[in-house]
Amino acid sequence: MASKTKASEALKVVARCRPLSRKEEAAGHEQILTMDVKLGQVTLRNPRAAPGELPKTFTFDAVYDASSKQADLYDETVRPLIDSVLQGFNGTVFAYGQTGTGKTYTMQGTWVEPELRGVIPNAFEHIFTHISRSQNQQYLVRASYLEIYQEEIRDLLSKEPGKRLELKENPETGVYIKDLSSFVTKNVKEIEHVMNLGNQTRAVGSTHMNEVSSRSHAIFIITVECSERGSDGQDHIRVGKLNLVDLAGSERQNKAGPNTAGGASTPSSGGSGGGGGSGGGAGGERPKEASKINLSLSALGNVIAALAGNRSTHIPYRDSKLTRLLQDSLGGNAKTIMVATLGPASHSYDESLSTLRFANRAKNIKNKPRVNEDPKDTLLREFQEEIARLKAQLEKRGMLGKRPRRKSSRGKKAVSAPPGYPESPVIEAWVAEEEDDNNNNHRPPQPILESALEKNMENYLQEQKERLEEEKAAIQDDRSLVSEEKQKLLEEKEKMLEKDLRREQQATELLAAKYKAMESKLLIGGRNIMDHTNEQQKMLELKRQEIAEQKRREREMQQEMMLRDEETMELRGTYTSLQQEVEVKTKKLKKLYAKLQAVKAEIQDQHDEYIRVRQDLEEAQNEQTRELKLKYLIIENFIPPEEKNKIMNRLFLDCEEEQWKFQPLVPAGVNSQMKKRPTSAVGYKRPISQYARVAMAMGSHPRYRAENIMFLELDVSPPAVFEMEFSHDQEQDPRALHMERLMRLDSFLERLSTSKVRKSRSWCQSPQRPPPSTTHASLASASLRPATVADHE
């Protein structure tokens, strides 16, 4: 068993190159990558280089060329990491590279063919095979699946895959995702089914580089909890967490555009990722997706550069969701493997060089892994406590009564339940049967438990029947009761007993079903494979690990020998003649000059890379500025200022996520109850408040109108028409003109008041005539009449 903690452990980096595709061969692209598997070196040749320019060489922990197999990568590189996870360490495997270089193939592969299965299915098989071969250990395996699409975290196993999840941080457990679903799995088939469900909702699309390109970062999380009894007699729980990461492709946006041939896009949440069946439909989404992908990968590169430099005190984990989730895997409590996937074609030179530099920086990261022993929030401990509680209830009901333990025919001692497993006679019998059988011909727990329950139920029924017979005999012997009363009491006793038995049986069956369901979730090894085959498989695994370790040591020794040869060549200072000294020093000078030129070329490439990254960032910044200006324009022209102020007052900065959010309309601490809606009044079509009822009773205009438009009377009053003839002298008289205007205004106001009274009257009120009022025309005629009479006289 590995040590519980190590001072530091370097991040393991391996490189893998795919073969040339048919499309690249047809286009005439040449191969620019050379993989030295023995030395662990990758040599990259610039197709546009000057005649004297040397190729660039990078050294990694392991290198796999185009002829390598999936099993080679897993056995030599990933298998030791999975063994560490089963011992309680955190582990991470992630693939990084350009789109179309084989990241998804490396991580998942082809599920149907065993030889082409990738890291994830091989890890499934490895975990459950180890559990089946373990002894005196109890396991609980659960799986989660998420993706990061355009900087939004989505649960691929949720019924609402488009729902956005939040990142939280706990001082004890670290970074976690709130409301992330998790499924307990019992075998390889179940965990494969969980992953297939998640793959159906993952965001993929067609680009120039790949017809089925991953447009999101996907992380499959496996949590393995193990319970084992220690030397102190107590159960100790270890929790190992495995992150299997399939990153989206890193490439420039002009190469990540939509495929003009038209490729289907299948984003999660059923279309939020854009892109229908044509390339034009996806044209608006692909640049946006590529921008978000490059931003997150750029943040990942900044984190790796800060960790590798050992000079920066601040590590920018919070720059993206991806780096927050991988915080433990990069410089924290985890063992991490990075698989750098490369494209060999000449048109991928820039991307391959960027990937190699990225991987070369990652080699310098130091992690501090430790065993996660006895954490507080383990699901396995909750399962054990729940099983113990159900077992106690069943024993209290007499369904799991104590039985003598079986002894083997060979005189062995009684076999107890496995450590950490709640003792029960069913489990005792199960384990004893397997100990008696050398061939491990086990019986499944389900029939044993069912037979035990049936037998104990029969005993319980027999006891109740005997009790009933005793009560019947007591009633029969009671001479103070008449025969009718005795018969009535006997019938009541039988009915009560039958009812109690039925209720007891239902409750017991429910408890037993829950007990069996909880028990079946826990995995105990040593049952599924024969001992002889078990030992052979263990020996094969040990031999395979020894071979992989020997290859790794051989590769390291060869690298050290090359360095020492260079050092010894420099230290040799004895020459037989001046000619020999000139030749040796000339050769050394040429070699140093070539190194100088390589360093200058590297500096120039770094400068060009810096300019390219800066241009990409400026382009992304300009795009965000355009979007921001558009939103400001919409806000200024279409949203009222008061609504804008309300929105601005609700905004606050969430320091944990570094995002602006809205405060709730109702504070969480205020227990405010909503007002009840007015109940419907008798005879009215709608609910009416008390104020409206009083207003209607007073005859005034009610606040809430309850009348039906069908009950309103039609306005059939004839229009008021005035025909007035004025002489030429009257038309010239200003008082006559004023009189005409007042009469027209009076007619208009009279019609308006009549229509208002009719429309405001409810269907339950009788028609009322408007009160007579003094009109402007009458006042005017009254004021004019004395003057007119005087003039006439």
From Swiss-Prot:
Residues bound to ATP: 97-104
Keyword Coiled coil: yes
InterPro entries found in the cross-reference section: Kinesin-like_fam, Kinesin_motor_CS, Kinesin_motor_dom, Kinesin_motor_dom_sf, P-loop_NTPase
Positions in coiled-coil regions: 376-630
Residue span of region Disordered: 251-288, 395-423, 756-793
Transmembrane segments: none
Keywords: ATP-binding, Coiled coil, Cytoplasm, Cytoskeleton, Microtubule, Motor protein, Nucleotide-binding
Biased composition annotated in UniProt, kind: Gly residues: 270-284
A Gene Ontology cellular-component term: cytoplasm
A molecular-function term among this protein's GO annotations: ATP binding
Basic residues compositional bias, start-end: 399-413
Annotated GO biological process: microtubule-based movement; mitotic cell cycle
Localization terms from the record: Cytoplasm, Cytoskeleton
Region annotated Globular, chain positions: 631-793
Residue intervals of the Kinesin motor domain: 10-365
Sequence similarity: Belongs to the TRAFAC class myosin-kinesin ATPase superfamily. Kinesin family. Kinesin II subfamily.
Role this protein plays: Microtubule-based anterograde translocator for membranous organelles.
Subunit-level organization: Heterodimer of KIF3A and KIF3C.
Name of the protein in its database record: Kinesin-like protein KIF3C
Organism encoding this protein: Pongo abelii
